Amino acid sequence: MASLLKAFIDPKKNFLARMHMKAISTRLRRYGLRYDDLYDQYYSMDIKEAMNRLPREVVDARNQRLKRAMDLSMKHEYLPKDLQAVQTPFRGYLQDMLALVERESKEREALGALPLYQRTLP
């Protein structure tokens, strides 16, 4: 069952997945975003922790891309075609760190320790 699901969502094997990936890529390129920019740090504490561990330059570049995308959206415009061509929407920067943080939190849970970011009142 798992192999069937992996084959179904793999863009190399499934035409619909390939079309979906192309549509997502086009929409992200219009605003100059990357797929990892769509993660909300207020949604999950793991994402927030992964963002805190990233280098400052990466976080600043992410914030700049998000501000530019919001500005373009407010103006009902897209990036110029020459800038859209150089965008890399699926070049990830957060996935590796997020996987590390999730692995650490699962390990802490297995050991019976409290998560690093769980707040408790004295």
Swiss-Prot record:
Location within or outside the cell: Mitochondrion inner membrane
Chief place of localization: mitochondrion
SUPFAM superfamilies noted in UniProt: 14 kDa protein of cytochrome bc1 complex (Ubiquinol-cytochrome c reductase)
Keywords: Electron transport, Membrane, Mitochondrion, Mitochondrion inner membrane, Respiratory chain, Transport
Keyword Transcription regulation tagged: no
GO CC terms, sorted: mitochondrial inner membrane; mitochondrion; plant-type vacuole; plasma membrane; respiratory chain complex III
One of the GO BP terms on file: mitochondrial electron transport, ubiquinol to cytochrome c
Record membrane topology: Peripheral membrane protein
Signal peptide (from-to): none
The organism's place on the tree of life at top rank: Eukaryota
Family assignment from sequence similarity: Belongs to the UQCRB/QCR7 family.
Functional note: Component of the ubiquinol-cytochrome c oxidoreductase, a multisubunit transmembrane complex that is part of the mitochondrial electron transport chain which drives oxidative phosphorylation.
Description of how the protein assembles with itself and partners: Component of the ubiquinol-cytochrome c oxidoreductase (cytochrome b-c1 complex, complex III, CIII), a multisubunit enzyme composed of 10 subunits. The complex is composed of 3 respiratory subunits cytochrome b (MT-CYB), cytochrome c1 (CYC1-1 or CYC1-2) and Rieske protein (UCR1-1 or UCR1-2), 2 core protein subunits MPPalpha1 (or MPPalpha2) and MPPB, and 5 low-molecular weight protein subunits QCR7-1 (or QCR7-2), UCRQ-1 (or UCRQ-2), QCR9, UCRY and probably QCR6-1 (or QCR6-2).
Protein name, entry field: Cytochrome b-c1 complex subunit 7-1, mitochondrial
UniProt organism field: Arabidopsis thaliana (Mouse-ear cress)
Recorded name of the encoding gene: QCR7-1
